[in-house]
Curated annotation (Swiss-Prot):
Keyword Nuclease appears in the UniProt entry: yes
Function: RNaseP catalyzes the removal of the 5'-leader sequence from pre-tRNA to produce the mature 5'-terminus. It can also cleave other RNA substrates such as 4.5S RNA. The protein component plays an auxiliary but essential role in vivo by binding to the 5'-leader sequence and broadening the substrate specificity of the ribozyme.
Gene name for this UniProt entry: rnpA
Organism: Pseudomonas paraeruginosa (strain DSM 24068 / PA7) (Pseudomonas aeruginosa (strain PA7))
Protein name: Ribonuclease P protein component
Pfam families documented for this protein: Ribonuclease_P
Coiled-coil regions listed: none
Similarity remark: Belongs to the RnpA family.
Domain of life: Bacteria
Keyword tRNA processing in annotation: yes
PROSITE patterns assigned: RIBONUCLEASE_P
Length: 135
């Protein structure tokens, strides 16, 4: 079982890490007042980055509340999100939504991201790979 913490290794920290997601996202999920960009990271855990600017969410109290709620939602869903670098971008109006509505919206975003995840074939399922029997 994956721990449900939000340590430093579960965060996108550098401009290079953010740029990698912005430049070539493999998953893009628009939501109400939010955009979620994701990219495969090749790790056994997901990483999260948040972009919540003053221009879109005016009050610091609202920005901090949003960050707290997004991190909490991510923490509870990180087992399913393993292998993704995810950037969540806040748009105008996100700060005005109530907490229950935000929880519901973030849950839907994670599910939509997982639904859009490209299927990866295991080597045994790939065409042309021998299954151990020789003809």
């Amino acid at each position: 079982m994956v721990s449900r913490d939000f340590d430093r290794d579960k965060r996108l920290l550098t401009a290079r890490q953010f740029s990698a997601v912005f430049d070539s996202p493999t998953g893009k999920v628009p939501g109400k007042h939010v955009l979620l960009l994701a990219r495969e990271n090749g790790l056994d855990h997901p990483r999260l980055g948040l972009v919540i600017g003053k221009k879109n969410v005016k009050l610091a109290v609202q920005r901090n509340r949003l960050k707290r709620l997004i991190r909490e939602s991510f923490r509870h869903n990180q087992e399913a999100l393993a292998g993704w670098d995810i950037v969540m971008i806040a748009r105008k109006g996100l700060g005005e939504l109530e907490n229950p509505e935000l929880h519901q919206q973030f849950g839907k975003l994670w599910k939509r991201l997982l639904r859009n995840r490209p299927r990866t074939e295991s080597p045994a399922d790939a065409p042309g790979v021998a299954d151990g029997t020789h003809a």
